[in-house]
């Protein structure tokens, strides 16, 4: 959340409003660049609670073959098999969640190294 908040503040300073933040569709061998659904939800909640009102009106979406889906579209979740099912416009979207064992947050100092 700290990284997103800092980047959003910098965009605001350049008069650029953040409208959407996308989590990319999972592809093979992409685990190093992904986050789990639980961590994504925690980041959304943290950013929304800490960002000023003019900054927290963005939408946080998961990319899917039929378009963007939000957590409000979550229809079913199986934590054992790490499987999520979203429904959008009557279409079912199966989404593999990243197991928590593979989900390790990056170092904030490393991610914001150029901001110092």
Question: What are the functions of these language-model segments?
Answer:
Residues 12-116:
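Auxiliary Fe-S-binding modules of radical SAM enzymes
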Residues 1-11, 69-70:
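Catalytic cores of alpha/beta
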